[in-house]
Amino acid sequence: MRCTLLKHGAQASDIYTVQVPGSFELPAGARLLAGKQKLDAVICLGCVIKGETSHNEYINHAVATGLTNLSIASGQPFIFGVLTPDNEAQALDRAGGKHGNKGVEAATTAIRMAALKKELTDKTKIGF
């Protein structure tokens, strides 16, 4: 992810990395970070592997809803980069393995959404 941001013009000093205890805390951590720094986007990465119960579904739904609500309320892109695999092998396949890299995808989404926000903010025309 970091390499993707740097490749597209981000400065290393402008990339902030913070960690939260678990995926469930991603929305709260993202909100705390966004409240302290002027950021173009907030990329939230995590992994919730399915267990023997449906607990993962509640976590995934809460995180997705939390990040969506933050994006809508703030007008700032909060990017959902959470893997939701059934097992560790699937997680590794999606974290740079044979099924791509969710971190790179999240970084690309952040770049595109930040560009869209800038484009729409800079426009003086009214659109409907």
Language-model-detected regions and their locations in the chain:
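Glycine-rich phosphate/diphosphate-binding loop of Rossmann-like nucleotide-binding domains
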Residues: 2-21
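A charged, well-structured terminal subsegment
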Residues: 100-128
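Phosphate-binding/catalytic loops
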Residues: 86-100
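Glycine-rich phosphate-binding loop
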Residues: 25-67, 71
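Short, ordered loop/turn segments at secondary-structure junctions
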Residues: 20, 46-48, 83-87
